[in-house]
Amino acid sequence: MPAVLDTPVAIRRTAMDLLARREHGRVELTRKLRQRGAPPELIEAALDRLVEEGLLSESRYLESFVSYRARSGYGPARIREELNQRGLQRADVERALKECGVNWQEKLQEVWQRKFAGELPVDARERARQGRFLSYRGYPLDMIGRLLSGRGGDD
């Protein structure tokens, strides 16, 4: 039987359980607690307290999310869009992408190498296919163009 979330203690316990599994953003944690039936005013108070105690941190969430998605082979545009959909501030998202320490050109090269075995496209159709794949993964078109023309990051 699911726990009844009608007291601050129960809401805090549930929020802590969710945070123990992985970092969450405030918007995401609020949504999950509401889905479990917690009243909005109690959620806000509980989350404010978690922020004060340093247990809920947007910057930690952004850092872990960007790192995880970059390791999974996604580019900055895709990660930016996913974070914007999660209701995070655009300035915070941009800062996290800048400070993550990921070399996006190297990541693009790794993803391309893994998917296409380093085979440069021989015709326009193959170039378009590879470009679409890399674009869908969230890499900028200028980087993709340099890579597929054989110039890589040597500009």
Curated annotation (Swiss-Prot):
Domain of life according to the entry: Bacteria
Q: What's the protein name? A: Regulatory protein RecX
The entry assigns this protein to a family as follows: Belongs to the RecX family.
Which cell locations does it reside in?
A: Cytoplasm
**GO CC field:** cytoplasm
Listed PANTHER family: REGULATORY PROTEIN RECX FAMILY PROTEIN
**Sorted alphabetically, which NCBIfam families does this protein's record hold?**
PRK00117.2-1 (NF001054)
